[in-house]
């Protein structure tokens, strides 16, 4: 399993909101964006493609995305258009995204360390693979 680098920018979602959530076979994609500042200027975007653990807390509801149970995907839709408050590493390679409401998404690495857990597609075109 790869780890986050020492110079990982935890402000990468500063000023962003969750614009879109996509579900695929064994994958959840979270697309974040900053509001467009001027016409004709492409907005800042960052995407997380999660293939391993994805947990969430919305109000008092705590859940985990289970690829075999599509009903575990529905609560994630409540995060749409929420502003990001912070991103922090709560355990090695485990990122917690906290929203302005206090609700959270936890992106976790693969327990076995044998597979890619998640990829972060940065606005610059760089990709971070964990």
Spell out what each predicted region is:
Residues 1-130:
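Surface-exposed, interaction-prone regions used to assemble/regulate multi-protein complexes
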């Amino acid at each position: 399993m790869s780890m986050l680098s020492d110079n990982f920018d935890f402000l990468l979602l500063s000023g962003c909101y969750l614009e879109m959530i996509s579900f695929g076979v064994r994958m959840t994609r979270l697309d974040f964006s900053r509001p467009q500042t001027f016409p004709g200027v492409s907005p800042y975007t960052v995407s997380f493609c999660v293939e391993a653990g994805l947990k969430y807390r919305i109000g008092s509801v705590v859940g985990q995305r289970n690829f075999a149970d599509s009903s575990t995907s529905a609560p994630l839709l409540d995060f749409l258009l929420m502003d990001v408050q912070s991103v922090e590493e709560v355990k090695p390679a485990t990122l917690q995204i906290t929203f302005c409401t206090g609700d959270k998404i936890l992106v976790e690495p693969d327990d076995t360390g044998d597979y890619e857990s998640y990829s972060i597609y940065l606005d610059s075109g760089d990709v971070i693979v964990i």
